[in-house]
Every structure is written in structure tokens, then in C-alpha cells.
Regions:
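Extended charged/polar low-complexity repeat regions
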Residues: 35, 52, 92-880
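Intrinsically disordered, low-complexity segments enriched in small residues
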Residues: 1-129, 215-217, 240, 252-253, ...
Length: 880
């Protein structure tokens, strides 16, 4: 039987995250590779962002400009095959109409495609983004020539033809080139921000049209090797920048197609990962059922234009098994079951006596044909996690219920603890407080109601209002922006307003930098309003955002943040007290330096250096603090910390002759668990290691800790009973029961003879807040809270009541009075910026005053009447 890979394989199994994001896809058995190379920001951070990602698909055996099988994740439409590939990697067969493209297999309209002219298409997304496509006649493929953000700001894309395929060459915004792609023999170079000080190169090294290495601007990159199966290339060996090695093995005569099709599709049967640096290999093997995502066992339809499984009977399912092998024996088995719509309906994970089953019911009915399924048929409806102890046969279930509408909006969410969130959305045509949505998607939330579980607790309602913001000059469509949120608490069925948030935006249609940016945000509680105004200043490639917060009493506080317009990373921050912090980064966004009080006599810097992994050394991050102390953290190929070393700062070594000393090291087993850690102290230049060993139970949790001093710590965590038992060998036990919120219901201590030494019991409301605590002798303390989860009332065992009141302008824990049994013991006063201005305790009053908007007091007046002035504090550190 012939084995073959083909781009003609059509299955919606490829439109799921495991396939699109890379790795071994348990649905299909394919090993794909997706390498994220960062995000491109545009238009001074006010334009569309482009995810910069390269992906390998073994089913694509063409070289479209990046090497065989490799491509950038960009939207395109092939007029010959009628296949539309979206920017998220999903692929759909299209039906062409006079007005646009329709996709029979895209029930939930995450994207709409319009025909805007001869050879031109427009892809509209739910988030308001648009992509304008133009057909390149030489290739008969439509590619993106412009991406327009919801606010109207756009970027343009340029393409050329390579090997009869359109290939991206440049991405530009209105100011500069964001990305340039150049090709020469044996190499493809992707340059971010070319011809600028921020320029950085990513290189694909090719040999015989195969990508054999991907080089990063700094440090190591990826090394790639392939296996050829019937003329098709499959990744066989992948080495990542940390030098972990992946080995992928395939079964050549793999998945069978529908009956009568004489070919097979290879699948992965083993995936080994070698982290290196003395860490254990991770070994996984895979097996698959005869029935598969290709529809083996089905009679092929005359019209094979769609997914064959969509025409399968409702009983058609296929499975895959993933086995984690440790020491040549099965350690963990994961069995996955998929229905005819490629939806994961069951996942059973078994390790020894521990078994966890995740079952998912969807908004679909497998008994009905595809054309009768609702738009949200792929969305989960009931998600049930079952914990089973196979030794005792006891089990416990946790259920999550979700409900989606035909637009994919989440209408109802019931958590396992019983807390329920119900949402309403405005229709695409809008409503009283929402304009018509320009792109025709119903995506704006109208109302959200959160109801506590059966035990009671606060229920809240939030309303959302929106406005149509004018279009940017030259843009076709206006944008919809949120302008108001009103938060209510339900008190005996009556909505009581607790806070209101209002937003306004800059209306500068001729200025893309500021148009649509937030101008002011105000929060009102109890008729007291706190306003924050924002201003924006562009200084080359530095965007300064100034936030000015004015309290209800007119107190003003200002802070600043400077962002790189090319990376979006913070370059500097100025806090409300004038403290300044500056940051520096390398070409791939890693921190290089952090300087506090830069440019002053108080300047102090922390620096980072990154040593690339090699045969001689591990990938290492070197941190040097302001006093010259140096720490080296080394990582294995999976990014796990394996050693920490430091220099002896007590005995400075200016010549750098004294080697660093190892303070910490770790070892991991073949299941990926940390089984050994060593902490090393140094005395008179000699190491004094302290070794701790760990053992794990079948649930993957630490069950035994062997300390260096001989102590043996036991932990039995039982997810079935929601019980945790801990003890030191030779001592009594502590048993803790937890509730649905993961909080303790009771903590009971036992003697060596299993005699109870006392039990503390807790109760909770339906929001998971503690309502009472009863100690081992029966004393009960009760608690009450306000709508912002602040403790307002405590009733002690002797019936004494402690009542705490908070500032009515804030939702933070800012207490203004504490009273016991009706008698006020203390009072405090805060200004509109939550700064303490006065305090009365036992009739004695103290006061504080502040300069401008600083948080530190300028003066303090004690109860004795003496006034203290603080003159030594440097308020404006960046000017000192």
C-alpha cells in the first residue's frame, strides 16, 4: 500500500490548537512546529499588531519562500483549490458567491469574507480587525495587502512571487518599514525594523530547500533535521535554543483514508525529549485507533469536497493513546476520544491507582447531520472532571456548565463551586446604549450578573454602555468604544449602585497616535468621583504616557510611563513620588538593565547577561546587582532551573579570580518531576550541602519529603475526598478538608495513637468568603463583608462586635473607623488619593500633610502637638 502526504488532505481536525500551535497533535498524529518570533507593533502602538510566527506543516511539501513546509501565518485565499487560510492557521473550503465567500464548515462566523471588487476580498474579524486581500495573478492566490485595526489605523504588506507562490517581502506602517524579508541562496533573512537602531535579524538557513537552522538575533536558535517518507519531509530532530533535543519517530504506513483510497498518512509513534545537563529523558509513545480523523472505515462520498467525518454516523469516534514511559515501563496513560466533529469528548489520564476523566458535552448532536448543527456546535456545554481512586473505587465529580449563543458569546458560566455568571450581549444592530456594530458582529456585552452559590453571598450586576467613535481620517468605518460601566449589588432583589466607571476618548481624526486613545477615566462611589486624565507625547520611538489622578477633594497625583513604540516594552517609569526607573532590553526583548534613580547620585542598577547554551555550558542568566553581587542561574533544555551560583560578596574579588559558588541544584526524573534539590552553604570556603529528596504519588503530587537532618515529611493529598493529611514521621497527623473553593473546611490534629487533639471548623458563603471559625474548644468567631469583600463585622465568641467602616470613595481596604460594641476606638481620615491625613486613637489626634501628590508625608503632627517636618526625603529623585 502506498504511503503519501498531500496538501489535498482536508479535515477540520487541523483547525484545533494542538495542530496550529505545534508539537504532537494527538488528534492527527502529526508533529508540527510553530516558532513564535515576537509581535510587530505599528503606528506608535496605536495600530494593528502582527503576530510574527513561522510554522511547519508536513502536509505542505511546497517551498513557498521559507523552505519546504514552512510558512508565515498569514491570511491567504487560493482561487484554484478554493481554500481560505486565516491568520490563526485555520483552513476552510470556500463557496464563492457574487458578494463574498461562504464556508460550509465554518458554522461559527469568526470571520466574514466579502468580495470588494475584481480580484479583491475583505476579511472581517469579530474583534473589529479587517484584512484587505488582492489576487496576485501570477499565482492565483489572494494575499493581504493591508491590515486595518478597529480604530482605522492600518499597515500595508508587499509581496513578490517565489516558486509560483506569493511571498511576503515587507510590512510597513505610515512611518517606517516594520519587517523586511530578503532571500538569497541558502538563506532567508527576516529583519524587524530594518535600517534603524532597533534592527534585528532572524535567519532561516536552508539546505536543498529545507530549513536546517533558525538563527535568532542573539544567542542560539533552532537546529532541524528531517526524515523523508515517500518523498515527503517530516521533522525528525529538533534542537531548541536551550539545546533540548527532540527526537520524533513515525510509522510510515500510518493512518488509512476512507475506504477505497489506496494511501496512508504517517503518524508519530514516539517523541523523546532530552533536556540535557544530567536531567532525565522524557519519553512518550503514541498509538491510534483504526478509525481516525480521515474517516477510515467510511465509504467515500461522491462529493468529497468536505470533511468526510461530517457525513459519518453519530456513533463514529476515534481515539489516541499517549503513554509516558519511565524506566521502560508505563507511567501515565492518556486516552483521548474524539467524535465525528473532531471534538474531544473524553480524556482519561491513568497513573497507577489515580484516574482523572475529563468529559465534555458540546452544543452539538452527533445524531444530526452537519447542516442541522447550531452555529455554536463546537462550543462546550458541560465539562465534567471525575477523580477516581481505582483502589477504593471512590470518585468525585466537578462540573462546569457553559452556554454560548450563535455568535460564540458566553451567555452562562457555572463554576464547579456554584458561582454563576450570566451575560447578555447587544445584537449587531445595537441597542439603547450601544450603536450598530460596523462589521456586523454581536460582540459587545450588555449586562453581567454574578450570583453566589447556594450558601449565599453577594450577587452583583454590571451594565455596559458604548458609543460610536468617529472614524480616523481616511478610514472607512467608525469604531465602537466602551464609555460606562455601572456596578450594582443585589440587596434583597433591589439593585443598589456601588460604583460607576466612565471613559472618554481623544477625538483627533488627523492624528493616528492619539485618535481613540483614552482621555479620561472617572470612578464614582457614593457621589465622590476620582478622575484620571491621560496625555500622550511622542519623542521619536518613545511614547510617554502621563497619568494624572485627581481625588474628589482636588488632590492631584501624577505618574509617567515611557514605552518603546517598536516593542511595546516599558523604557522608563516615574512614580507618584518622583522615583524614576529605566529599563534596557536586548534584541529579543530580554531585560538587560534596570536603573533606579537614573542620572542622580542615588542611581543603582541591576544588570542581566544571557549566556547561550553550548556543549560546555548550560543556558545561563547572570544577574549583577548594584553592589557588585553576581548570581548565575542555569537552565536545562526545558527551561527548568538546575543550578544557582553566586559570588562571595562578603569577600569581594576585584580581579574576578574567585569562582562562583553553587547554592542550589536540582534533578528531575523521567516523568518531569523534581526529585532532588540541594541547598549549599559555605563555611571557610568549604561547601556544606543539604540534600532534600522528593517522592510523588499517582496524582503527581509530592507524597514524601526526605530532609537532610533525617526528618521525613509525609503528605497524602486525596482529590477524591478533597482531603490532605500531613505529618512528620514519628509525630501526629494533621488532616485538612477543603471545599469547592479550595479553602479549608476543617483542620484536625491527631496524636500518634490517632486520637483527635482538636478540630478547627470553618464555614463560607457562596462567594468563598469565611463566615465563621470555630476553634477546638467550641469558640466561634463570625465574619461579615461588604460588596468589595472587605471585612466589616466580626463577632467574637463572647458576643463582642467589632465593626470596621471604610472610606466611601474607595473599594480598597481603607478603614476610617473601628468600633467595638458600639464604642468607637479609632478613627482615620483619608484624602481623595487614599493618603492618611488624620488619626484619632483613644481621643488622641495626629495629623499628616503632603506636598503635591506624593505618598510620603511632608509633615507630621503628633498627639502632643509637636509638628515634625521631613526635609531629608528627596521627593524628586530624578532631579537630585
Amino acid at each position: 500500500m502506498k504511503s503519501n502526504s498531500s496538501t489535498a488532505v482536508h479535515s477540520n481536525a487541523f483547525n484545533f490548537g494542538e495542530f496550529v500551535s505545534g508539537g504532537v497533535d494527538p488528534r492527527t498524529g502529526m508533529y508540527t512546529c510553530a516558532l513564535s518570533l515576537g509581535k510587530l507593533h505599528s503606528a506608535d502602538l496605536n495600530g494593528p499588531d502582527v503576530t510574527f510566527s513561522l510554522s511547519f506543516n508536513p502536509l505542505n511539501q511546497a517551498d513557498v519562500g521559507f523552505g519546504v513546509g514552512w510558512s508565515l501565518t498569514m491570511t491567504r485565499y487560493d482561487l484554484r483549490s478554493k481554500i481560505m487560510t486565516l491568520s490563526n492557521g485555520e483552513r476552510y473550503k470556500a463557496v464563492e458567491t457574487s458578494t463574498g465567500l461562504k464556508f460550509k464548515e465554518m458554522k461559527l462566523q469568526t470571520a466574514k469574507v466579502l468580495v470588494t471588487g475584481p480580484g479583491r476580498y475583505e476579511v472581517r474579524y469579530k474583534d473589529g480587525r479587517r484584512e484587505l486581500l488582492k489576487v496576485m495573478a501570477a499565482a492565483q492566490i489572494a494575499v493581504v495587502e493591508k491590515i486595518v485595526a478597529a480604530n482605522g489605523v492600518s499597515i500595508t504588506l508587499k509581496h513578490d512571487v517565489f516558486n509560483q507562490f506569493p511571498v511576503l517581502t515587507e510590512i510597513n506602517d505610515a512611518k517606517e518599514c516594520l519587517l523586511r524579508i530578503a532571500r538569497k541562496a541558502g538563506q532567508v533573512t527576516l529583519t524587524r525594523h530594518p535600517d534603524t537602531a532597533s534592527s534585528s535579524d532572524y535567519k532561516l538557513i536552508l539546505k536543498n530547500s529545507l530549513v536546517t537552522a533558525i538563527e535568532l538575533p542573539v544567542g542560539k536558535g533552532w537546529d532541524l533535521e528531517y526524515e523523508v517518507i515517500d518523498g515527503a519531509r517530516y521533522l525528525h530532530r529538533v534542537v531548541n535554543p536551550l539545546r533540548a533535543v527532540e527526537i520524533i519517530r513515525y510509522k510510515q504506513q500510518g493512518h488509512h483514508f476512507v475506504n477505497g483510497v489506496e494511501r496512508t498518512l504517517p503518524f508519530v509513534i514516539a517523541h523523546d525529549v532530552y533536556p540535557g545537563r544530567g536531567q532525565s529523558r522524557l519519553c512518550k509513545t503514541y498509538t491510534y485507533s483504526d478509525r481516525n480523523f480521515l474517516g477510515h472505515g467510511l465509504i467515500p462520498a461522491k462529493d468529497d469536497d468536505g470533511d468526510p467525518l461530517y457525513r459519518a454516523p453519530g456513533t463514529y469516534v476515534y481515539t489516541s493513546d499517549e503513554q509516558l514511559v519511565v524506566g521502560g515501563k508505563l507511567h501515565t496513560l492518556i486516552k483521548r476520544t474524539y467524535n465525528k466533529f473532531h471534538l474531544l469528548v473524553a480524556q482519561v489520564t491513568t497513573c497507577g491507582d489515580a484516574q482523572t476523566t475529563v468529559a465534555t458535552e458540546y452544543h452539538c448532536s452527533v445524531a444530526k447531520p452537519f447542516n442541522e448543527q447550531p452555529a455554536q456546535f463546537r462550543m462546550p456545554k458541560v465539562h465534567t472532571v471525575t477523580y477516581l481512586d481505582r483502589r477504593t473505587h471512590q470518585q468525585r465529580k466537578e462540573t462546569t456548565v457553559t452556554e454560548f449563543d450563535g455568535e460564540g458569546n458566553l451567555l452562562k458560566y457555572v463554576e464547579p463551586n456554584g458561582v454563576t455568571t450570566v451575560s447578555e450581549f447587544y445584537p449587531a444592530t445595537g441597542g439603547d446604549n450601544c450603536p450598530e456594530v460596523p462589521l456586523g458582529f454581536a460582540r459587545f456585552q450588555k449586562k453581567s450578573t454574578v450570583t453566589a452559590a447556594a450558601a449565599g453571598g453577594p450577587s452583583t450586576v454590571t451594565y455596559y454602555d458604548y458609543v460610536l467613535h468617529p472614524a480616523l481620517a481616511g478610514a472607512e468605518l467608525a469604531s465602537v468604544l466602551p464609555i460606562e460601566e455601572r456596578d450594582f449589588e443585589l440587596v434583597q432583589g433591589v439593585e443598589v449602585l456601588r460604583s460607576k466607571t466612565e471613559r472618554s476618548y481623544l477625538d483627533t481624526p488627523d492624528d493616528p497616535l492619539k485618535h481613540g486613545a483614552t482621555r479620561e477615566q472617572s470612578v464614582t462611589r457614593n457621589d465622590k468621583t476620582i478622575r484620571t486624565a491621560f496625555s500622550y507625547e511622542l519623542e521619536g520611538t518613545r511614547l510617554r504616557v502621563i497619568s494624572s489622578t485627581r481625588g474628589f477633594d482636588d488632590a492631584l497625583q501624577t505618574s509617567e510611563k515611557v514605552l518603546s513604540t517598536r516593542t511595546g516594552l516599558p523604557l522608563a517609569e516615574v512614580g507618584v513620588d518622583g522615583e524614576r526607573i529605566e529599563y534596557e532590553y536586548d534584541a529579543i526583548g530580554r531585560a538587560l538593565r534596570k536603573t533606579i534613580a537614573a542620572g542622580t547620585i542615588y542611581a543603582a542598577s541591576t544588570q542581566w547577561a544571557y549566556l547561550a547554551a553550548s556543549k560546555q555550558q548550560m543556558a545561563t542568566m547572570v544577574t549583577t546587582d548594584s553592589s557588585g553581587g553576581e548570581q548565575r542561574v542555569a537552565y536545562d533544555g526545558l527551561g527548568r532551573v538546575v543550578t544557582v551560583q553566586e559570588k562571595d560578596t562578603d569577600h569581594p574579588d576585584k580581579e574576578g579570580l574567585i569562582p562562583t559558588r553553587t547554592l542550589y541544584s536540582a534533578m528531575h526524573d523521567a516523568a518531569g518531576q523534581k526529585v532532588r534539590s540541594t541547598l549549599t552553604d559555605w563555611r571557610d570556603g568549604k561547601p556544606c550541602p543539604v540534600v532534600t529528596l522528593y517522592e510523588f504519588d499517582d496524582w503527581g503530587q509530592i507524597s514524601k519529603t526526605l530532609h537532610a537532618d533525617g526528618r521525613i515529611e509525609h503528605t497524602v493529598a486525596d482529590p477524591v475526598l478533597r482531603q490532605q493529611t500531613t505529618w512528620l514521621e514519628g509525630l501526629g497527623k494533621t488532616v485538612t478538608l477543603v471545599n469547592e473553593f479550595g479553602k479549608p473546611l476543617s483542620v484536625e490534629r491527631f496524636s500518634l495513637k490517632d486520637k483527635s487533639l482538636g478540630k478547627t471548623v470553618y464555614t463560607y458563603d457562596g462567594s468563598g468568603r469565611t463566615t465563621s471559625q470555630t476553634d477546638p474548644v467550641g469558640n466561634t468567631t463570625r465574619y461579615e463583608y461588604d460588596a468589595f469583600d472587605r471585612l466589616v463585622r466580626t463577632v467574637l465568641p463572647d458576643a463582642s462586635e467589632m465593626v470596621t467602616a471604610y472610606a466611601d470613595h474607595s473599594d480598597e481596604a481603607v478603614p476610617v473607623s473601628i468600633a467595638v460594641d458600639g464604642r468607637v476606638l479609632g478613627e482615620q481620615t483619608y484624602d481623595g488619593l487614599n493618603r492618611l491625613t488624620a488619626s484619632i486613637v483613644g481621643g488622641r489626634k495626629s495629623e499628616a500633610g503632603y506636598e503635591a501628590g506624593y505618598t510620603q508625608p511632608k509633615w507630621f503632627k503628633g498627639a502632643g502637638g509637636i509638628k515634625y517636618l521631613y526635609l531629608s526625603y528627596c521627593f524628586k529623585m530624578h532631579f537630585c
